[in-house]
Structures are given as C-alpha cells and as structure tokens.
Amino acid sequence: MISNRDHFFGKFSDHCINGFCLIIMCILSGAEIRKQLKEGKIIVEPFDYANIGIASVDLTLGDEFRYFVHHNGPVPISDEAGAKDYQKFSRIMKCDDGHPYYLGPGQMCLGITKEKVKLPSNLCALVEGRSRFARLGLSVHITASFINPGSDNQTVLEIFNASSLTLALYPGTKVCQMIFMTMEGEAHYNGIFQDQAL
C-alpha cells in the first residue's frame, strides 16, 4: 500500500534524506529574466532593463492609493464576504506632480505598481519588499505576495507602516521586486482579481 506521504513526496524521492524531503523550485536568474523578456515570454510594461537585478525585477509604485475610512461596527472576514468588500470602507487618492502619499504609524493603505506584468502559464512569481524600506518599517505586502501563472496585471500592494514614523510614499519609487519561478506543469489564472484595480 502506498502511504499518503509516499504519494505526496514520491516525485521528490531523489531529494529525500533520512525522511527529510526537499521541494526544489527553480528561481530565474537575472540573465534568464532578461532572455525571457526579450523572447516575449515575460512581458513587463512599461519596462526599463536597468530594473533587472541578480534574480528579480524591481517594480515601481503607481500614483493611486486606497485608504480606509472610519466604519462603525465589525467588518466580517469570512468565505461568504465579497472579495471586493474592502472598496466599501475605503476611498481612492491620486498623487500628482511628485507629491507623496503620507502613511502614518500603524496605518495601512493599498497601492498599485506602475508596471503591468504578464506571466506565461509555466511561471509563477513572488512580490517582495526592499530591505532599505523594510528597515524603516515599511511592508509592501501584508500576506498576499503570490502571483499566479498566466496573470496579466498590475500588482496591488497591501502596504503597512509598522514604525513610529510617518512615511512619505512617492510614486515612481522602486518599492518592491518580483521573483520569477518555474513550476511543474502549466496553469492559467482566471480568478476574480484577473483585472487588478484598486
């Protein structure tokens, strides 16, 4: 009889030692990212090749932010809640002409990348913050860092200020980086956030 463990880890058996199994994922290097961009497999618009790092691509902050307003009573967090209910409790602000959005201590807002990224069906991605900003208490994604294969979107950022400082968020800042990973098989995202917007 094949155990559940064997069924799950069977294809990783070559990477198992004394019962400990490693699940290997392939992260694209900067050179491979550049190659796939030139071949049109990954599409980033608008794009500057100077934003390619050792194993990631820097993405910049757009000029729209969604901030939350006061609401009386609890807001339900459940599977039955609408995926876009957050829009009922928030408003959009646009920052023009180099003006920043000010994020106070302990506050959260939604931002969006200037760039739209299109992934092929065999690649997924992660969005990570940058260390220089994290050291000031800035988190650019609270939990939702995974980008599905086949996505064709700007990336919405759940931005949180964990510091005691007021942070000035300037549109155009390289605020996060995207890491690309190959996956076994192919898939295509067709979920509710396929057309991302604040």
What residue spans do the PLM features occupy?
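N-terminal amphipathic/hydrophobic targeting modules at extreme N-termini
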Residues: 1-9
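Short, Lys/Arg-enriched N-terminal segments with co-localized hydrophobic residues
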Residues: 11-24
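DUTPase catalytic domain/fold
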Residues: 21-198
